[in-house]
From Swiss-Prot:
Species annotation: Heteropoda venatoria (Brown huntsman spider)
SUPFAM superfamilies cross-referenced by the UniProt entry: omega toxin-like
Pfam families: Toxin_12
Compartmental location: Secreted
Disulfide bonds: 3-17, 10-22, 16-32
Protein name: Omega-sparatoxin-Hv1b
Tissue localization of expression: Expressed by the venom gland.
Record's comment describing the protein's domains: The presence of a 'disulfide through disulfide knot' structurally defines this protein as a knottin.
Similarity comment: family membership: Belongs to the neurotoxin 10 (Hwtx-1) family. 02 (AU5B) subfamily.
Length: 36
């Protein structure tokens, strides 16, 4: 199954790859970023 790649738009962590998080980058944009 595909998962949200880096900087892929998302609504929640479920939209991102495992160990990635849906993080805000601005007022309304949420993008997948790697969780260390």
């Amino acid at each position: 199954a595909d998962c949200g790649w880096l900087f892929h738009s998302c609504e929640s962590n479920a939209d991102c790859c495992e160990n990635w998080a849906c993080a805000t980058t601005g007022r309304f944009r949420y993008l997948c970023k790697y969780q260390i």
